[in-house]
Amino acid sequence: MQFVYSWKLEKGDRLPAGKRDDLALREKEREIKQRLEAELIPQGGEITVLELVKKYISLKTGVRQNTKTGYNFVLNIIKKEEFGKRQISSVRLSDAKLWLIKLQSDGRGYSTIHTVRGVVRPAFQMAVDDDWLHKNPFEFQLATVVVNDSVKREAITRKQERAFLNYIRESGCYKKYYDAIYILFKTGLRISEFVGLTLADIDLEHRKINVDHQLQRTMDMRYVIEEPKTSCGKRVIPMTDDVYVCFRRIIENRPRPKNEPMVDGKCGFLFLDQNGNPTVAMHWEHYFNHICTSYNKLYREQLPNITPHVCRHTFCSNMAKSGMNPKTLQYLMGHSDIGVTLNIYTHVQYDDVETEMKRVVNAE
């Protein structure tokens, strides 16, 4: 144990006769405090960035499968980076910024960097809360450091939707996907909800779709059933006449395997792959990609990148443009916050603005 002393308590105190002048005790206390705040507690500060993130993730129990996948994605990136080997006590604010800039220079997209920081920042905050660090070096606005070059997923126009669906329907190679893709455009289902649908979820008699779960596949190729994030994700969607016809065809043409695959007590999945397993989101991402690529090779007027999630955007946008009540649309989309429905999934283009202005002016 070390001690400090001074012949003066405060700076303005009188120095005793014969004693050498020195800093007052309160001044020395302030210096010591500043030095302690600048230093780091060694036992915690010696662990590496990778070890810190692993510890943080180990405490996140009971998270959804998508979240686990995201954690593993971030871990794999950090494992490949020299930054992951650094002791957390050596990481300063400028180091954190330079690392994220490096990730973008290496070709990582803004959304990937956003995901990485979304895990690393709370991990470092955990170190602060545990008194391993005094400051969180990742506590800054991401947009001030890296350029947001992400491409916003927009809803496609009705003309593009018709062209895409017509191409699929007339294609000898892709027409087997027509009914499913039509349903995605006309119901706004999440792809994980769609692939999770079973025969028991489709009520053809009353023309209803029961949505109360999602089908996911883990990194180790296990199939899992997950409930929606919130109670709003559980809903019953009415079928239009066209959607009813599509579902009826899908069920009539569905193969009957000798052994129905079962996932967490559910069986009778509408779509199976060549191995007899339920299709998952990745399958449909590939189908959409192949169709778009094929279309754009044939036609001069190119289609944008269309994905299952673009179908969901498009459904929401079309319903909003048609004047659907916002609360009804929120229910159909399964959103807990109507702000998500209105601000994220509703896309207004110039043609829509022009049409709406003409409608209002003519009504006067």
Labelled PLM ranges:
Residues Q2-S90, S94, E252-K266:
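N-terminal DNA-binding module of tyrosine recombinases/phage integrases
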Residues A17-D21, G45, I57-W132, G172-C173, ...:
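N-terminal core-binding DNA-recognition domain of tyrosine site-specific recombinases/integrases
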Residues D106, Y110, N166-Y177, T187, ...:
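Short, basic (Lys/Arg/His-rich) helix/loop patches that form interaction surfaces
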Residues H114, L133-K135, E139-L197, E205, ...:
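Basic, Lys/Arg- and aromatic-enriched nucleic-acid-binding interface segment
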Residues A143, L197-P255, M262:
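Conserved tyrosine-mediated DNA breakage-rejoining catalytic core shared by Y-recombinases
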Residues V147, A155, L215, M333-K358:
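Catalytic-site neighborhood detector that most strongly recognizes the C-terminal catalytic loop/helix
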Residues D201-K208, M324-I344:
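Short, polar N-cap/turn motifs at the start of nucleic acid-interacting alpha helices
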Residues D220-I225, S322, N343, H347-E364:
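DNA/chromatin major-groove-contacting recognition/catalytic segments
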